[in-house]
């Protein structure tokens, strides 16, 4: 179970940056209004749906561990793209990839959590997984907001990508071995 909770924790702590910073990025960095912000989140949603449908195909050619690792790297690269972009098209591509990565990581780790424990503790294991996600969103979001306020949204997004790679990759290396 710990083999799935640690990657969930690492990914969500870093990935919470986009949830808190996108409402600021849309108007400040891209000059978008409410409809532009909605468009970026719609692209996230489209990416999530396509990502969900791609998981079975990915699992036919790669292990669950490799799928999660690839999606984690995709998220980090997508965040860097959003941070570096001054154009809506690039930010939309980044949010699309983020959506695909988000659902791939969380669905895969949730499935792994459920299948790694006996049936009599499955509900508790899923609950622990959900608590890890929610706790990281609750803790990570204000942390990324404070960093963005002290520096810049671009710096905070890039830092979250760096943190994801620094903390996430070692936890995923452990995950790959288990």
Predicted regions and their residues:
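C-terminal transmembrane bundle of multi-pass solute transporters/carriers
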Residues: 7-15, 19-178
